[in-house]
Curated annotation (Swiss-Prot):
The gene is SYT1. This is Synaptotagmin-1. Keywords: Calcium, Cytoplasmic vesicle, Membrane, Metal-binding, Phosphoprotein, Repeat, Synapse, Transmembrane, Transmembrane helix. SMART domains: C2 (SM00239). GO terms for biological process: calcium ion-regulated exocytosis of neurotransmitter; negative regulation of calcium ion-dependent exocytosis; synaptic vesicle endocytosis; synaptic vesicle exocytosis. Residues 16-50 are annotated as: Disordered. Ca(2+) 3 binds at D244, S247, K248, D250. GO terms for molecular function: calcium ion binding; calcium-dependent phospholipid binding; clathrin binding; phosphatidylserine binding; SNARE binding. It is a single-pass membrane protein. It comes from Aplysia californica. The lineage of its organism: Eukaryota, Metazoa, Spiralia, Lophotrochozoa, Mollusca.
Length: 428
């Protein structure tokens, strides 16, 4: 029995040993197992499929972009650039905020504790805050120093005088000026000289304007009728101005020559430093200024006058104001061709009008007419009084002649200019 069991056991062990050897020597096909090296469930097969899908999506995207119109492509690119710029701006702004916060914290570290300063007593206060009684003295010293520094040379003027005793005439020659200050933004000036006799100023002459120069050469002569008996009471005045078409002319300086202080028996030629105009000479403009434009169309024979505004008019009423209006008169010789006037502006010394007036003036008559613009103070009860006037035409002089000439030289173009009002002669 024991021998039978031993034989059965050996046979079973032999059967179990043979299949195991076949599985080892026969390879995967013999054992019925799958080839792990070539086909695994999570291996290269799935990766190849993913790559194929990506290539497919890429091709579709390229095809769609190629089919898009040009404006859509440009819009996409612009949007992308805008997004990029916004991102950069946000990053820069955030970094700047962080930097400011850091600087603020640094500044706070150096702040002074006011309580601790108060505890230091008067010794610290005296060092930091000086005695207030000393401040005015120091300030006055500084003002004196600044006033001496602010003294600016106004330049100088050369002129000559020759008096004819037989005719009772004074010939004045304005030769030149030198080292004038720059009155314009460009550092230059447009100087001209007014020449008149004080105290009456009945006759006033002006030189030509010299553009953009600080050393003008005039060489212009003028003659005043002055009887010898009146020579001693006259003061010859040279007032140098900077010409400005659109605003009031600025006075640079003046030279005053009392005729009783010079030897009229010979020709006098001299240089004089320009002095600042005093209050009396500034009253030359006491009547005020007026601004108006002139426009002439030769083909239509039409002269257009636009009264724009006036300023610094003379006070004519008891209350220190005026009720101004402007009269425009067109004359040929002594004959008045046309007369017009603006509206009345109540209680003002700086009226604004902006009123236009037209006159029919044929081209052959434009050289013969005279335009008189008069500012009048309206009075309801009594007689309206004239404040001052301007006379323009080919026979006028100074800024008035210059304005008239500019109008004729620029047809169809309005030429605006400020004028100083002159006294209206009394009627006989």
């Amino acid at each position: 029995m024991d021998s039978l069991l031993a034989r059965v056991k050996r046979a079973a062990d032999a059967d179990a040993l043979n299949p195991a050897q076949e599985g080892v020597t026969g390879g995967p096909d013999a054992a019925g197992l799958p080839d792990v090296s070539t086909s695994s469930p999570g291996g290269g097969g799935a990766g190849d499929k993913l790559k194929e899908k990506m290539d497919e999506y890429k091709d579709k995207l390229i095809n769609e972009i190629e089919n898009l119109p040009i404006w859509a492509i440009v819009l996409i690119i612009a949007g992308s650039l805008l997004f990029l710029v916004c991102c950069v701006y946000c990053v820069c702004r955030r970094s700047c905020r962080k930097r400011k916060k850091k600087e603020g914290k640094k500044g706070l570290k150096g702040a002074v504790d006011l309580k601790s300063v108060q505890l230091l007593g008067n010794s610290y206060k005296e060092k930091v805050q000086p005695d207030l009684d000393e401040l005015p003295v120091n300030m006055e010293d500084n003002e004196d120093a600044e006033s001496t520094k602010s003294e600016v040379k106004l330049g100088k003027l050369q002129f000559s005088l020759d008096y004819d005793f037989q005719k009772g005439e004074l010939s004045v020659n304005v030769i030149q000026a030198a080292d004038l200050p720059g009155m314009d933004m460009s550092g230059t000036s447009d100087p001209y000289v007014k020449v008149y006799l004080l105290p009456d100023k009945k006759k006033k002459y002006e030189t030509k304007v010299h553009r953009k120069t600080l050393n003008p050469v005039f060489n212009e002569s003028f003659t005043f009728k002055v009887p010898y008996a009146e020579v001693g009471s006259k003061i010859l005045t040279f007032a140098v101005y900077d010409f400005d078409r659109f605003s009031k002319h600025d006075q640079i300086g003046q030279v005053q020559v009392p005729l009783n202080s010079i030897d009229l028996g010979r020709v006098v030629e001299d240089w004089k430093d320009l002095q600042s105009p005093d209050t009396e000479s500034e009253k030359e403009n006491k009547l005020g200024d007026i601004c108006f434009s002139l426009r002439y169309v030769p083909t239509a024979g039409k002269l257009t006058v636009v009264i724009l505004e006036a300023k610094n008019l003379k006070k004519m009423d008891v209350g220190g104001l005026s009720d101004p209006y402007v009269k425009i008169a067109l004359l040929q010789g002594t004959k008045r061709l046309k007369k017009k006037k603006t509206t009345i502006k109540k209680n003002t010394l700086n009226p604004y009008f902006n009123e236009s007036f037209g006159f029919e003036v044929p081209f052959e008559q434009i050289q013969k007419v005279t335009l008189i613009i008069t500012v009048v103070d309206y009075d309801r009860i009594g007689t309206s009084e004239p404040i001052g006037r301007c006379v323009l035409g080919c026979n006028s002089s100074g800024t008035e002649l210059r304005h008239w000439s500019d109008m004729l030289a620029n047809p169809r173009r309005p030429i605006a200019q400020w004028h100083t009002l002159q006294e209206v002669p009394e009627k006989n």
